[in-house]
Design a protein with these regions (language model features):
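Anion-binding alpha/beta catalytic cores of soluble intermediary-metabolism enzymes, centered on
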Residues: 1-63, 69-183
């Protein structure tokens, strides 16, 4: 399962402001480029709604219908298999059961919290949009346990293995990323 964040380490207020048409177009292009590097470009990219119930016909906000739906339609017109917006509380159970391999979360905790709840420390942070493969462990720096001989190396090994597996197809990801202004 690959989870992409339209916004990352910003406040929720800032994330809502940052979810805009250009950002959504760019993230969908980057996810598509990444899926092509994995030779899985035909798999759908599931986009999570920003608001509860993906806005529920604009009852809970207009961002889903005004920003996300048009971005998904533009992606489809460009040949990208994007679907949504799907309410996050529906999207995640479907993803865990295998329906989706590529997800776009609108903000950090919408993507990170459920991923960590299901997969724990078995995640790898992949930075898409750079000319080189850049990965890191998904759990942070762990400064609180540094020097205590209790850190586990499994996450680092997983990150290194993922970097090696991605390196061969990375040029296609970078080519697509360099055409956008980034996210």
């Amino acid at each position: 399962l690959y989870v992409f964040h339209a916004t990352t380490h910003v406040s929720l207020r800032q994330a809502i402001d940052d979810v805009n048409p250009k950002r959504m177009d760019d993230i969908l292009q980057l996810v598509h480029a990444f899926s092509k590097a994995l030779n899985r470009q035909d798999e759908p990219i599931a986009v999570s709604g920003l608001n509860p119930h993906a806005g529920e016909n604009n009852i809970f906000g207009t961002e889903d219908s005004a920003i996300l739906t048009p971005a998904i339609e533009r992606a489809k017109a460009a040949g990208i298999n994007a679907v949504g917006p799907i309410p996050a509380d529906a999207l995640w159970p479907q993803a865990v059961r295998g329906k989706w391999k590529f997800l776009v979360a609108c903000y950090h905790d919408q993507g990170h919290a459920p991923f960590k709840a299901v997969y724990g420390d078995d995640g790898v942070n992949i930075t898409v949009g750079l000319p080189v493969v850049r990965v890191s462990v998904d759990h942070g720096t762990a400064f609180d346990i540094a020097g205590q001989n209790i850190a586990r190396e499994e996450s680092l090994i997983l990150a290194a293995e993922r970097a090696a597996s991605l390196s061969l197809g990375w040029s296609s990801v970078w080519e697509a990323a360099s055409k956008s202004e980034g996210v």
